[in-house]
């Protein structure tokens, strides 16, 4: 179970194509309000790092779930499951199982990929959408993060290049260098909060590598070449696009994506 005290009012497992996925609901008493479905990033990460959303539970139920091959869910690690369409189908199953006829959706990073794609194609019953530093175009993401990489200390960049040339991207030296990047552009708190370390400890590297790649600035997996921007104009619900100054989803890119959404605010 998660190390952070979540105080779930309800949790369990749901059968989906490929296995079982875990879900948990946090509710502060306002059960009649429109629930918020939280979709985590990765791929292969867990719901843990989304813990700050619990602060909203006094206003509405917050529904968390771990995608297949992530967190507390089953991990068949079958590449046949690593398709966007299958992950979108999980949202339908969660909605049906928990009777979420009306809801709002929050998606972060890869979760934003799913949230945007789902809302544009399954708008019925969705009141509002929050896209938090979303991955919407892989090539743009790689370009932005390679720019960030070039801003790292020269010695850190040299370790990365030397390890990549030598085929030693699994080495401790390379992991330490990438950690410098993550501490600038994934989470800048020092030390990292427990709910962030919980997520990294639960990371399914097989799923992450198979769908994305070895790190945030190299994509060799299923999402290589992905572009979901064409669907943004089909999002009909009020949308909030959030991003931070140092986010891997660079502010300039997020502002550009927002221009395509008919009813959007940025924060």
PLM regions and their residue ranges:
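Conserved HGGG/HGGXW glycine-rich cap/lid loop of the alpha/beta-hydrolase fold
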Residues: 17-76, 80
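Active-site loop/oxyanion-hole signature of alpha/beta-hydrolase fold enzymes
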Residues: 63-110
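Short beta-strand/loop motif that positions the catalytic acidic residue
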Residues: 235, 241-243
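Conserved hydrolase catalytic core segment
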Residues: 101-147
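Helix-rich cap/lid subdomain of alpha/beta-hydrolase
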Residues: 139-204
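N-terminal cap/lid segment of alpha/beta-hydrolase-fold proteins
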Residues: 2-20
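Hydrophobic, aromatic-rich cap/lid helix
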Residues: 194-228
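Conserved alpha/beta-hydrolase "acid-adjacent" motif
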Residues: 248-253
């Amino acid at each position: 179970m998660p190390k952070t005290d979540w105080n779930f009012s309800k949790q369990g497992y749901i059968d989906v194509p490929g296995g079982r996925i875990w879900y948990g609901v946090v509710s502060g008493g306002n059960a009649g309000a429109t629930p918020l479905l939280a979709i985590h990033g990765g791929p292969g990460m867990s719901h843990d790092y989304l813990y700050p959303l619990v602060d909203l539970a006094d206003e509405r139920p917050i529904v968390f779930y771990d995608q297949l091959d992530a967190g507390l869910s089953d991990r068949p690690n079958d590449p046949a499951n690593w398709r966007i369409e299958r992950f979108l189908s999980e949202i339908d199953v969660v909605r049906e199982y928990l009777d979420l006829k009306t809801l709002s959706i929050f998606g972060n990073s890869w979760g934003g990929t799913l949230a945007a794609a789902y809302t544009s194609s399954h708008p019925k019953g969705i009141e509002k959408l929050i896209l938090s530093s979303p991955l919407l175009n892989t090539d743009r993401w790689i370009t932005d993060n390679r720019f960030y990489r070039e801003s790292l200390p020269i010695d850190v960049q040299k370790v990365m290049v030397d390890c990549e040339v030598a085929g030693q991207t699994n080495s401790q030296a390379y992991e330490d260098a990438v950690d410098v990047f993550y501490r600038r552009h994934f989470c800048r708190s020092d030390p990292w909060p427990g709910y962030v370390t919980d997520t990294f400890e639960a990371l399914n590297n097989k799923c992450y590598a198979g769908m994305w790649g070895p790190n945030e600035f190299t994509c060799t997996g299923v999402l290589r070449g992905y572009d979901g921007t064409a669907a943004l104009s089909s999002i009909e619900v009020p949308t909030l696009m959030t991003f931070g100054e140092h986010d891997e989803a660079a502010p300039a890119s997020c502002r550009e994506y927002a221009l395509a959404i008919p009813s959007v605010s940025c924060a």
